[in-house]
């Protein structure tokens, strides 16, 4: 086991003392970086990049090489690898985003879906995790991730992205038995997939419930949170002599933090619509918090970025249990220098809140 040179991120998730607030950024390996665009061009297309462990490793490390302040790496992959491995036929349409050649519309469709084996069916992801861990050589921890069952189900039922989730919600209310069967199979798949990533070397994992906030409060409890709890219950929580923290992120889930805090994850991700000080008052005794700057702040000048970082740090207050991040992923049009100003500000301005 390679010793971690920087374990600030893991310590904050476990609410252990840190010198400064750790920072990383969702989609930190992405289109805003010219070096990422060059590697993607070399790969040919997005899925070819995801499925090449060496190139996935290359783009995972690019932001760390550019920004020495980053306290974690996140596996470069896509949340839709699981449905693709179930035989749904993932492809990307220019300007349309992800699409599936097969759509799930009945209980018979769901019963025919396999639960993918991480090494057999998603070996390229496990190989990428192993390659990244080797190349990181203990520089920072590596985060693995998956989409949540509800979020994956929406893509599988809709056949791709959706603005209104018409088919998914129709199935949820018209045929809850079918939706529960799909979510249960996805929960098994996600548990197996994340455990595979942990075995391969992921030192923390995040569940992205990107579309949980589209649900009513009652439907969120029944059709999203229930299945994330099943996953958390089934995850490997100790590996290589260390706790493997779990981060739960429901975009639009700010009203439900108390319920989310009961699931057993070490941390909750917050989107930018939450006040982090209020969130800490509500659930900070039970969980660490990750977030939550509006990604659009990165379009502003470095002084404005710094001011917003200062505001969020002050809102959280003194002590550990905060991982600074955006409230969602960085957008492709952001100037890379502005991301650098963000990371620098977090470390420079947060020292006063620790020690």
Swiss-Prot record:
It catalyses: uroporphyrinogen III + 4 H(+) = coproporphyrinogen III + 4 CO2. One of its GO terms (cellular component) is cytosol. PROSITE patterns: UROD_1, UROD_2. Keywords: Cytoplasm, Decarboxylase, Lyase, Porphyrin biosynthesis. It is found in: Cytoplasm. Pathway: Porphyrin-containing compound metabolism; protoporphyrin-IX biosynthesis; coproporphyrinogen-III from 5-aminolevulinate: step 4/4. InterPro entries: UROD/MetE-like_sf (IPR038071), Uroporphyrinogen_deCO2ase_HemE (IPR006361), Uroporphyrinogen_deCOase (IPR000257). It comes from the Bacteria. The record marks 78 as: Transition state stabilizer. Its EC number is 4.1.1.37. One of its GO terms (biological process) is protoporphyrinogen IX biosynthetic process from glutamate. It holds the Pfam family URO-D. Substrate binds at residues 27-31, 78, 155, 210, 328. GO terms for molecular function: uroporphyrinogen decarboxylase activity. SUPFAM superfamilies: UROD/MetE-like (SSF51726). Belongs to the uroporphyrinogen decarboxylase family. HAMAP family: URO_D. Homodimer. Catalyzes the decarboxylation of four acetate groups of uroporphyrinogen-III to yield coproporphyrinogen-III. NCBIfam families: hemE. This is Uroporphyrinogen decarboxylase. It comes from Pseudomonas aeruginosa (strain LESB58). The gene is hemE.
